[in-house]
Amino acid sequence: MRLGGLSKKLMAVALSSVMVVSGFAGLAPAVSVSAADDTAKLRMIFTSDLHGQLTTEDYETGKVYTTGGLSRTATLTKKAKAEVNAKNSLLFDLGDVLFDYTTDYIYDVNSSAQQPMYTAMAKMGYDAITLGNHEFDYTLDYIQKQLSSTGMSGKVVLSNVTNVNTGAHIWAENKIITKNLVTESGKTISVKVGLIGETVPTLAKKRTNYTGVLNGEDIVKNVKKEVPILQKKGADIIVVLAHSGIGEQKPAELDANTGYALTKISGVDAVLCGHLHKDFPDANGTKYDDYPGVNKTTGIVNGKPLVQIENRGASIGMVDLNIGTKNNKPTITGKSTQIRKVNASTEVDPTINAAFGNWTKTFMADSSQILSEVAADTQLQNYFGTMEDNDAIQLLNNIKISY
């Protein structure tokens, strides 16, 4: 009798336990993600060729600028970052931050003043930048001081520019950034992102001549040299930050535009481009669409993401890499590219827009100053300009000589 009663009690407890477990299972069904499918998205966002266009004003024309500007670009970069896990993004710039009316004015009027472009960029949290050819228009000493005073010097990666006499790099030859990416299931994948920074090897020489001072190495040759160096350092992924356009299929020695050729280099996983002030891929078509290995829709070229963007903050470029693991090592399982454009409805970041500070009044006054007036029905011509000087041509010549 006692054993029978005990058996009934045990059976009742077992049944109630099954009901409880089943009830909880119904409320929160378990979701299983296999290790092979559990990936993390690494999003790389970049700007390029900002050329001093910081605010919503075009001080060269005195008009409102609605299709670009870092103050609107900053909004796009924030949104792009917010779409992925906070640990899963990187922000880069490809150079030519300077070289426009505003940056030239500041340099000429007060060369010790901080360039607001770098002040603004320091607030945006760039992970790495490279330099464009036009940075070198402002002399090496000037650009070094600007980057140092704004805390941006440590962000610079410039692989193909060295000191002529010592062979030493002026800034970091390359860089590895370790990212602890968060996967879809909440786990972590540690990936070492290797960065190579390239600029136009002939530099720019408006105010100084770098002959005997700096040496610019051919971009393609330099990238081929840097890849094994980064691999030896343990880089899992290698990205080229190229102040260089896509260019020809077989660029000439010291060519400024080499992006397509860079996609053919073994070990390179993605190429980010600028310099030419044009988007690729572009729905309207580009001259590169018929190159071998080019997917004009996805921006995947020779199996690798290749993105080139416009100037003055008109667009940002993005490369998304899906990162998984194979044999306990990070591996790329998917890739995509994207370009996002600024327009009049893009929200303005007030902090970035205010970075010009007191310079704003100076620029507004200068751009609105009337130098001369011409009657509406006046006709200007220089039909005989090839035979003799005239006032119209001489004015232009004087401007060029002064510049």
Segments and roles (model prediction):
Residues 1-14:
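Bacterial Sec-dependent N-terminal signal peptides
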Residues 15-23:
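Hydrophobic core
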Residues 36-341:
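Acidic, metal/ion-coordinating pockets
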Residues 7, 194-197, 283, 317, ...:
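Glycine-centered structural positions embedded in regular secondary structure
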Residues 5, 30, 36-42, 65-68, ...:
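Non-catalytic terminal accessory segments
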